[in-house]
Each structure stands twice: as structure tokens, then as C-alpha cells.
A protein has these predicted regions:
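A short linear-motif detector with a strong N-terminal bias
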Residues: 15-17, 52-57, 130-134
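Catalytic cores and adjacent binding grooves of peptidoglycan-active enzymes
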Residues: 65-156
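Extended, low-complexity, intrinsically disordered C-terminal regulatory tails
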Residues: 25-56
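Short, well-structured alpha-helical interface segments that form or flank functional binding sites
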Residues: 18, 22, 46, 72, ...
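Active-site acidic/histidine clusters and adjacent loop/turn architecture
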Residues: 1-37
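Soluble non-cytosolic domains of exported or imported proteins
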Residues: 10-18, 42, 88-92
Length: 156
């Protein structure tokens, strides 16, 4: 089934790097098993500071902020299946769609559920295996894993 971004999601992609926008659109229309939308593209510093203070973000150097090229390099997605879904299997499925689309566009991505893999698109491992590897790595460092399955950021 081919899905299409809503007007609200398209509005949230304004100011996001065109290659990342293309990747999101292709992922949804060509590869996605589940419908998804965009919850965040460009973010201002005031919002970023609030998210960091609440623990929802780990940095003030977010790729959601406008970068030197004038674009945001990050998006957050939300999956739908009879309503909003936050369970990780939905985001693992979306991760496969995003990887396929990014390869088609020629974009390097980092996924928020496997931060240790800087070029997620170059990895051939299953998405859930990459996520498990990230969790194991963080445990071996006596640190907690920051799993942000909805988050995607481009690497330029």
C-alpha cells in the first residue's frame, strides 16, 4: 500500500534539507509497511533547551536546529496503525523503509535507535540487530541506551 504525507507533515518538513525530505517521502510512498507522519523537522534553540531539560534530548547541538547550509538535518517520525503507535517494532519497520529510501537518494543517515552506527545506510545488518548491538555497547560502558526510534538525522 502506498502512503502519502499529510499537509501537516509536509508543513513540518519546511526548512529540512531537500535530500532528507525526499528520503522521507520515498520511504513512505514506496517502502513503508505502516503509515507514518512527521512530528518535527526544524526546531529552535528555546525548544531544544526545553527538550534537553526534560530529558527528551541529550544535546544542545541538535541536527533539528538550522545548520550552516541553512537547513535542518533531522526529522522525527510517528507511526500510525489504527492510531499513533510508539512500540519499537513499528520504528524498526520504518527504519528499513528509511534505509531503502536513503540508499535510493544517496543520503547517509544516523538512526536514533543505533547511535553507534554513523552511516546506517551502509550497514547491512537487520535494524533490530543494530539496535541490540547499541544497547549491548552502552551496557558494556555502564551507560544507559538512549533509544530514539522516531529520530533520523542526515550526515553531510
Amino acid at each position: 500500500m502506498a502512503f502519502k504525507l499529510s499537509k501537516r507533515s509536509l508543513k513540518r518538513l519546511e526548512g529540512v534539507h531537500p535530500q532528507l525530505v525526499d528520503t522521507v517521502k520515498i520511504a513512505l510512498s514506496k517502502y513503508a509497511i505502516y503509515d507514518f507522519g512527521v512530528t518535527c523537522g526544524v526546531r529552535d534553540m528555546a525548544t531544544q533547551k526545553k527538550l534537553m531539560a526534560s530529558g527528551a534530548s541529550k544535546t544542545l547541538r541538535s541536527k533539528h536546529l538550522i545548520q550552516d547550509d541553512g537547513y535542518s538535518h533531522a526529522v522525527d517520525l510517528v507511526c500510525y496503525d489504527g492510531g499513533v503507535r510508539w512500540e519499537m517494532p513499528y520504528y524498526i519497520s520504518t527504519a528499513e523503509a528509511m534505509r531503502s529510501a536513503a540508499r535510493e537518494v544517496g543520503l547517509s543517515l544516523t538512526w536514533g535507535a543505533c547511535w553507534h552506527v554513523k552511516d546506517y545506510c551502509a550497514a547491512d545488518d537487520d535494524c533490530d540487530d543494530l539496535m541490540d548491538d547499541y544497547i549491548a555497547l552502552r551496557r558494556s560502558q555502564n551507560r544507559s541506551a538512549f533509544l530514539d526510534g522516531p529520530h533520523w538525522q542526515a550526515r553531510f
